[in-house]
Structure formats: C-alpha cells, structure tokens
C-alpha cells in the first residue's frame, strides 16, 4: 500500500487505520529520515489500538509502553550502539510478546526481527508531503 500524507493529521490518520488492523504479536518497523513523521504515525497507530495516553518519541528513553486494546511497545533504536544494547533493553520480550511492537529505525536490528514484520516507510517529498509505504 502506498499513500500520500499532506499534513501531520493525515499521517496520524493513516497510523490509526494501521493500528486498527494490528493483532496480538504484530511487529512494525518504521523507516524514514529524521522528522519524516515516524512518531506522528505512531500517535495515530496508538489511537487505533485504543490508547488515550500522550505518545512521545522514545529517542532518549529507548522504549515506551502504553496500554489499550493491546499493549504497545514503542522503541527507537537509532541511538543503540550494538545488537547487545537491543537485547539489554528487553527488546526480545517486546518483539516476541503478546502486544504490538513498533520500532523506529528498526532496519538497524532487522536480523533479530521475525519474518512477519511489517515495514512502513515514510519519505518526505519535494513539496513537503509524506509518502507512506506499507510492505
């Protein structure tokens, strides 16, 4: 699936659509440059999971946990120096757990993710809009 988002609200709405479709054990990798809208997408995804809490970027905390229809494990692995760091934050329990695991910059730990991982790419277009691709 490929779509174009014309605003932060559009990006969040697309996230909500995806969040409503996710099931227990889903793993989602978000790819995109800095400020491409990854966390904005996760805010919508969380709404689709019935989560009402404020969603913030886990860039410095590395992992945030939210509770809704399913538990959301929101990770940002951009700052991790090694796969060992990925294991140290308890990522394996999140990836192979019963909630939904969303990993920003997840391509950095792709070797540790299941085959059924969904990849969502956000790309900033020349006009400032975002192209969102789900694979």
Curated annotation (Swiss-Prot):
Required for the formation of a threonylcarbamoyl group on adenosine at position 37 (t(6)A37) in tRNAs that read codons beginning with adenine. Is involved in the transfer of the threonylcarbamoyl moiety of threonylcarbamoyl-AMP (TC-AMP) to the N6 group of A37, together with TsaD and TsaB. TsaE seems to play an indirect role in the t(6)A biosynthesis pathway, possibly in regulating the core enzymatic function of TsaD. The lineage of its organism: Bacteria, Pseudomonadati, Spirochaetota, Spirochaetia, Spirochaetales. Its main location: cytoplasm. Keywords: ATP-binding, Cytoplasm, Magnesium, Metal-binding, Nucleotide-binding, tRNA processing. It comes from the Bacteria. This is tRNA threonylcarbamoyladenosine biosynthesis protein TsaE. SUPFAM superfamilies: P-loop containing nucleoside triphosphate hydrolases. Coiled coil: none annotated. ATP binds at residues 35-40. One of its GO terms (biological process) is tRNA threonylcarbamoyladenosine modification. Belongs to the TsaE family. InterPro entries: P-loop_NTPase, T6A_TsaE. It comes from Treponema pallidum (strain Nichols). It is found in: Cytoplasm. Mg(2+) binds at residues 39, 104. The keyword Plastid does not apply. GO terms for molecular function: ATP binding; metal ion binding.
